Structures are given as C-alpha cells and as structure tokens.
Amino acid sequence: MASQGTKRSYEQMETGGERQNATEIRASVGRMVSGIGRFYIQMCTELKLSDYEGRLIQNSITIERMVLSAFDERRNRYLEEHPSAGKDPKKTGGPIYRRRDGKWVRELILYDKEEIRRIWRQANNGEDATAGLTHLMIWHSNLNDATYQRTRALVRTGMDPRMCSLMQGSTLPRRSGAAGAAIKGVGTMVMELIRMIKRGINDRNFWRGENGRRTRIAYERMCNILKGKFQTAAQRAMMDQVRESRNPGNAEIEDLIFLARSALILRGSVAHKSCLPACVYGLAVASGYDFEREGYSLVGIDPFRLLQNSQVFSLIRPNENPAHKSQLVWMACHSAAFEDLRVSSFIRGTRVVPRGQLSTRGVQIASNENMDTMDSNTLELRSRYWAIRTRSGGNTNQQRASAGQISVQPTFSVQRNLPFERATIMAAFTGNTEGRTSDMRTEIIRMMESARPEDLSFQGRGVFELSDEKATNPIVPSFDMSNEGSYFFGDNAEEFES
C-alpha cells in the first residue's frame, strides 16, 4: 500500500524484488528488458523475419500476444476443459506481415504454446520471468488507453463518460500483479469493484462458501489497492467503509461512484511507466547493448534514449496520417494517454493533438482488412526533451487537493497548472450527502470547492535535455494557463471491444 512505509518503487514491483538499492533495481529491470529483447530476436529467427519485418510494430504485437497467451495458465486450463470448435488449446498464433514483391502480405502462423514457453524461458536464463510478461501487458494496456475510448464500459457501471481520464489500465488482465495494480487509475479500480458488487447483488452465492471466502479476500484486496491511491484522509476513510461492509450493495456502489468523481479534482496516485514494444528491446540487444550491465529504468531517461535510436515501422491504411499514427504510438510508449497535451507537446517537441482530430485508427490490423492497399511508414518516436514519470496525481502542497481537469492524470513530473471546469465537476455533487459516509462526503466536497485551477502542480519540476542524463538542469516550461489540455476532447475513437 502506498500509505504504509513499505513503498516499493515501480521497478521493484515490476521485477518482483524485495527492497533493493537503486543500482540493483536498475540491474534487475535491465535483466527483464534484455530477456524480452533476446526472446524477440529468437522469434524473428524462428519466423525467418527480415530486419525490416522484425521492426514492424504489428509483428511485434503478434509475437508479444503469443507469449502472453502461452503463459496464461487460467485461460489455458479453461480451453482444455471447454474445447471449442476449431480452437486448439495447445497452440497460439496470429498474423505475421511480410514484404513480398513490393507488397505487404498477411500470413497466419500457429505455434505450440509449449515451444513458445521454451523459447521465452531460454531467453530469460531458464526462468518464467513473470516480470517481463507483465511489462508486455502494460505496454498493450498503454496502447489501448491511447487508442480506444471506454465510454460504454463507464456507462454500464453507472459512471460518467467524462471520467475517462481515470481509466488508465482498464484493459489490463487480472493476472498483472503488483506492477499492474500500480498503474491502474482510480476509475479502473472503481469499475472492477462495482462489477464485483453487482455480481454479488445478482448471485446469492457469490459471497458464500469456500469460493465466497476467496471472493471476499479479493474484494478487500482491491479496496486496499484503491485506498492506497487516494491521498486525502476523507477519501481513505470512505474506502475503509466500503471495504468493511458486511454485504456490499448499492450503498457501496454509490460511495465508489462518489469517490471516482472526487478523483477528478482530488487526484489519486497512479504510476506511469514507459513500456516499449518488444522489437525495440530486440533491436537494442541485437546491436550489442548490455541492459543488465548498463542498468535500465522505466521512469527516467532510458526509454527516451532507446526511442531516440530505434527505427520502428508501422503498417498504414490508405487514408491514415503517418504523423498521427506516430503520435498514438509515442503516447502509448510513454503512458501519456491521460497527460495534459501542453506538457506532452513540449516534451515531444511537436504538437500533440486531441484524439478527435487524429486521422488514424488503431495499430492492429483486423483479419478482414485488405492488405493490397497497405503501406508502411517509419514511426517518429523521438522526443525533444525527457522528463521523469510521476506516480502522484500532482496534488499541490502535501495532502491538499489541487485542481484536476475533467481529463488529466499527469504522467510527467513537470510544473503546470491543471485546468479544470470546477462547475462541471461540482454539478455532479449536488444533493446526496446523507447516510453513513455523510461527514466524509462533506469533507471531500469542501476540499474540492477550495481547489484553485491556477495552483501549480509539481512546482519547480522541469524537463531535461536528452544530453542531461543526470537530470541536473531542469527547464521549467511556461504554459498558456487557459488552454484546454485534454486528449479526449471531442472524442470519436472506437470503443475497446474485449
């Protein structure tokens, strides 16, 4: 929990390590990404991919998905027990794209899961290397966060679509561990809890018996994870109430939705990590870079450095804008889907536009799309500056809430004001302050009302030149205070279909 004195850094969560010093953490994260890189190189050899094909992000995603599927114990067991027509539970595969006579062709490949597991373990010194698998899951999750909207999922659980900025990590699989829990947004945790409570309301046996006991433990654990994301005493006290409820029902759902709304201004601590596609690590390992010796961090300069020197390609549909495709992948690489566009634009050095203005669809290509008209382009993933990733919501001075915006969850530790429409947010809090949590609700509303949009978050924090790897000279950008900074403004993205 973030509240106890046992904070582990993301890197420790990512590598399953106990407390380590900075050098050990850098080494173990380095070991993790070099394992991913070695695995990727081996897969390219197995599939006889050319250098160009191996740098294609769509091929990287297929290979990543294959290894995640090969290690998905629960699904593998389920598939063996419920054989479905035409699905071999022991095999995994996907589309691989190859260049043939000046055209891109799609080839569906199939591999034994056992074989994939063997290659993965071999690349990771014989270990299962769960941390590396989680790392790939987080990269896929960050890509989904930048690509799709979750309006339907929000509405289904009774939440407001404008709360999209709280939904980081909403497509992460259940098995993503502590590193996964750290990057989940407040809205994601609330949605998982509401789904659980609804099942309990509809199914009398959900909380009963031996299974029910396990369910209850999972429920309390999720409540504790969410509690640890809140930074004010009143929000945490409300979470205690929700967790201790004998028979969670509609009152708890109400409380959770209230808390999610409050997080638009009293933001939660949500971790951000730059997780890159496997092919990027593969390229670096192939060029002789020794991650373990050099060390690596997901929250410092290293991912920026790596992207400065990597050439990754992407398939482009006929009417897509390659620059927009690059923006999408850049945001995914830095987990910046919910960051203020003013900050992202400054760091990237080119204007980052809201999603409603992007002429691009997702990175993955559906199996029914026509390959004849597909082209490929280099993704521009370089940046002008680098900045440290944050794990706080950017609330100003200690526990007092600062301004949040209807859709920002800061990614970079860079000074800015957080523009928000207080009237819009506060309108959601009229009325209901009675019941067991009334004093906490009143306290939370009071804190929100005293938040000022002109307050600075991350005071004195700046970005750094790419040559400044020790972060000695912060450059504090000045932003146009009034500017709308939301990526999801005027959104028209596709819904995420699980």
From Swiss-Prot:
InterPro entries: Flu_NP. Keywords: Capsid protein, Helical capsid protein, Host nucleus, Host-virus interaction, Ribonucleoprotein, RNA-binding, Viral nucleoprotein, Viral penetration into host nucleus, Virion, Virus entry into host cell. A motif (Unconventional nuclear localization signal) lies at residues 1-18. GO terms for cellular component: helical viral capsid; host cell; host cell nucleus; ribonucleoprotein complex; viral nucleocapsid. Disulfide bonds: none annotated. A motif (Bipartite nuclear localization signal) lies at residues 198-216. Late in virus-infected cells, may be cleaved from a 56-kDa protein to a 53-kDa protein by a cellular caspase. This cleavage might be a marker for the onset of apoptosis in infected cells or have a specific function in virus host interaction. GO terms for biological process: symbiont entry into host cell; viral penetration into host nucleus. The keyword Ribosomal protein does not apply. Residues 1-21 are annotated as: Disordered. One of its GO terms (molecular function) is RNA binding. Its main location: virion. It is found in: Virion; Host nucleus. Belongs to the influenza viruses nucleoprotein family. Encapsidates the negative strand viral RNA, protecting it from nucleases. The encapsidated genomic RNA is termed the ribonucleoprotein (RNP) and serves as template for transcription and replication. The RNP needs to be localized in the host nucleus to start an infectious cycle, but is too large to diffuse through the nuclear pore complex. NP comprises at least 2 nuclear localization signals that are responsible for the active RNP import into the nucleus through cellular importin alpha/beta pathway. Homomultimerizes to form the nucleocapsid. May bind host exportin-1/XPO1. Binds to viral genomic RNA. Protein-RNA contacts are mediated by a combination of electrostatic interactions between positively charged residues and the phosphate backbone and planar interactions between aromatic side chains and bases. This is Nucleoprotein. It comes from Influenza A virus (strain A/Chicken/Hong Kong/37.4/2002 H5N1 genotype X2).
